[in-house]
Amino acid sequence: ANTDGYTIGMITFELATYKKLGTSELTWENYAPLCRVNTDAAAITVGAKWAADNGITDLPGFIDYCKAHPGEVQMGGSSNASVWHIAGGYLMSATGIDIQMITYQEGAATAVQNAAGGFIQGVTVSLAEARSFIESGDLICLGVMDEERNPVFPDVPTCKEQGYDITYYTQRGMAAPLGVDDAIMTRLEEACAAAIEDPDFVTFMNNNGQAISYLDAQGYADYLKQAAVDVAAAMDAVGL
């Protein structure tokens, strides 16, 4: 792409999977990070009836149940090798449990519907995607894989609060092509920082249950470097 600063793009979670899947040789190192804009954490959400029938009220109870019933619990994500499919692998690698990750080529919405209907035990998708069924009482969220609680669901604890150091989320950020002049990069970074604080943008994100999680250029680069390692381990756990 042209390096005059007028062409920038968005980096998403999927970039971390391309090389391991053989889709592309591209990695985050092929771009110049500008800022991280948003993260959307995976959450461990299960069918309310199934949880009640098995006395599960929190994340430790769910983990204990999975350890007592290895390979029996079916959790849905989305399509194969997608962010929420890999979230299940991260959950397994972080806790030592063995669950079946069911993929849905139609996407997370179908997985959520199947969990609400009792066809699978739960899902490892975002709170935003499971929101309507959580609010209806068909699903309950046992924990969110984030550093802090989701402001839309303040009563849902993080995994860390319950003794499990698990953070995992999809992410979206801005990047420029390699080779953009330093002075132009600085202007772009400043513009990103200002845009993040725009009241209309903040309102839009809050109304849609999307977490603003800004990182500057260096912070975003550090994050992407570590995420590449973490995602590779999670992919191994689901056989990718």
Residue ranges and their predicted role:
Residues 129-197, 226-229:
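C-terminal lobe and pocket-closing loops
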Residues 186, 197, 201-222:
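Mature extracytoplasmic/periplasmic domains
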Residues 13-15, 39, 49, 128, ...:
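Solvent-exposed coil/turn segments that connect beta secondary-structure elements
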Residues 72, 76-156:
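Ligand-binding pocket segment of bilobal, Venus flytrap-like solute-binding proteins
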Residues 216-240:
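Extracellular/periplasmic bilobal clamshell ligand-binding domains
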Residues 1-7, 20-110, 171-204:
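Hinge/capping helix and adjacent helix->loop/strand transition within the periplasmic-binding protein
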Residues 6-10, 43, 121-122, 141:
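Short, Asp-centered acidic motifs that coordinate Mg2+ and/or phosphate
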Residues 3-4, 20-32, 97-100, 133-144, ...:
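Ligand-binding "clamshell"
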